[in-house]
Amino acid sequence: MIGDIRKVTAKIAERFKHRFYGRTFQCPVCHLELALVDVNGNRLMVCPVCGVVLDVEEVYGHAVPVVLGVEVRRPQPKTRIHPLATHLPIGLYPFAVLGAGLLLIVSILGPVMPGLAPLLDRAPVLADATLVLLVLSVGFSVVTFFSGLRDWYRRYRRRPYAQIRLKIAFSVIFLVLGGLAIALHASGAAFSSATGLVDLSSPLALVLAAVEIAVLGAGMVVIATLGHVGGTLVFGR
């Protein structure tokens, strides 16, 4: 099952990558997919993963990278917070999505399925736990974002790699989506503060619950893409 999830995540990430990167080629050393637009005016670039200096030439419409050397004096921070901090948002967020989805299902099926009575009783606790997970996930995402910017400034010397630009853009999107999801959930307008469930008799509550689920789903796509692209910057391909 985990393998299937990874395949789906990779397919989603590939779609965004190809639109964002444009034409690409692979580093001949670590096989990281690089964007041709990142090559400077002298046709040179440094691979962000392995540090080789590449001379990228166009041969019959194909990008051919040639290794010229290695960037020896690359900054190597002793404490890199970013790779460690990313695990908390990525690990907690799916459980928040699962909690909200379970609350919606229980809200709809609970009245007609007696077997869900125990979940109905625990719905307020589940709603609170979902909110806590959302706050922790999005809160730690702020730490992840700024530690990533620090890595970009120091380790990658602010070079405008397509991977970095995509990660910055998607990080901002995730923070916006996460903040919106927290606001919706904490307001009690979608999932009642008293019962933890959606008030099926209220059209507004139904619409807001659907909006929250949609926002959470979009956040899953964004954070999965961030994790996939970030992984390539650590391990290559």
Model regions and ranges:
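Alpha-helical transmembrane segments and their membrane-interface junctions
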Residues: 179-199
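Cytosolic juxtamembrane amphipathic/interface segments immediately preceding
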Residues: 70-81
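Juxtamembrane helix-capping/reentrant segments at transmembrane boundaries
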Residues: 158-173
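Transmembrane alpha-helix entry/boundary detector in multi-pass membrane proteins
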Residues: 81-89, 117-139, 163, 167
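Short, non-ligating residues that shape and space the ligands of small metal-coordination modules
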Residues: 36-37, 56-57
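Short cysteine-rich clusters marking metal-coordination/redox-active sites
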Residues: 27-30, 47-50
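Residues immediately within or flanking Cys/His clusters that coordinate Zn2+
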Residues: 22-24, 42-44
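Hydrophobic cores of alpha-helical transmembrane segments in multi-pass integral membrane proteins
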Residues: 88-103, 130-149, 170-184, 213-227
